[in-house]
Amino acid sequence: MLSGLIQRFEEEKMKHNQERVEELSLVHVDDTISQPPRYAPSAPMPSSMPTVALEILDKAMSNTTGATQTQKAEKAAFASYAEAFRDDVRLRQIKRHVNEQILPKLKSDLGGLKKKRAIIHMTLLIAAVVALLTSVCTLSSDMSVAFKLNGTSAEIPQWFKSLNPMLGVVNLGATFLMMVCAKSERSLNQQIDMIKKEVMKKQSYNDAVRMSFTEFSSVPLDGFELPLT
């Protein structure tokens, strides 16, 4: 009988210990002790650069549509600043170095196109003068205009009238040259405007990368001072 009581006591003790272990293994929702410790948020705060870039783009797209070249250059500069704010730090540096390498070439091409445009414009003026003179000479010969010199009337000589066919050919050639020069000048103007826009975009992008934001708590664009060389 005593051994039976001892065995029953041992069974009750083991059952009680097992229930205690199961109770401790449970996590109570209302128990503040079982809650994990609270930590300060260590994740990096989202950058405000995309918001600034969006505001710059909104500024570039508002108001006028860029009818003049100055307004188009302004919008290109705004777009470049927005692009600089939106790009990653490494991508900014890569674009900056590429822009520094390509800008001298663009400026050289721009100077060459301006010289070519000046030559074509001068040729256009000369052709216009030749076309005007030949037109006046041909018209005077056809109308047999007489000039009065010292009280005596002088008519255009016959040999000059015989030059009318040649003058007509010269007039036609000068007119055709004027048309070709005008078309070439328009094409050069478009190329020059495009290169000017590219130069403005690349210079604005580099300025945005180099810029130290005194109005933004003196924090540079990339978070550290960039060398200017």
UniProtKB/Swiss-Prot annotation:
GO BP, one annotated term: symbiont-mediated suppression of host innate immune response
Sequence intervals crossing the membrane: 119-139, 162-182
Oligomeric form and interacting partners: Forms homooligomers via coiled-coil motif. Interacts with host OPTN; this interaction inhibits innate immune response.
Signal peptide start-end: none
Pfam family, one: Orbi_NS3
Organism superkingdom: Viruses
Its biological purpose: Plays a role in the inhibition of host innate immune response. Interacts with host OPTN and thus inhibits the recruitment of TBK1 to the host Golgi apparatus. In turn, downstream partner IRF3 cannot be activated and IFN-beta production is impaired. Facilitates viral particle release either by increasing plasma membrane permeability through a viroporin-like activity or by viral budding.
Protein family (similarity comment): Belongs to the orbivirus NS3 family.
Membrane topology: Multi-pass membrane protein
One GO location term (cellular component): membrane
Keyword vocabulary terms for this entry: Host cell membrane, Host Golgi apparatus, Host membrane, Host-virus interaction, Inhibition of host innate immune response by virus, Membrane, Transmembrane, Transmembrane helix, Viral immunoevasion
Name the record gives this protein: Non-structural protein P8
InterPro entries, per database record: Orbi_NS3 (IPR002565)
Protein's cellular compartments: Host cell membrane; Host Golgi apparatus
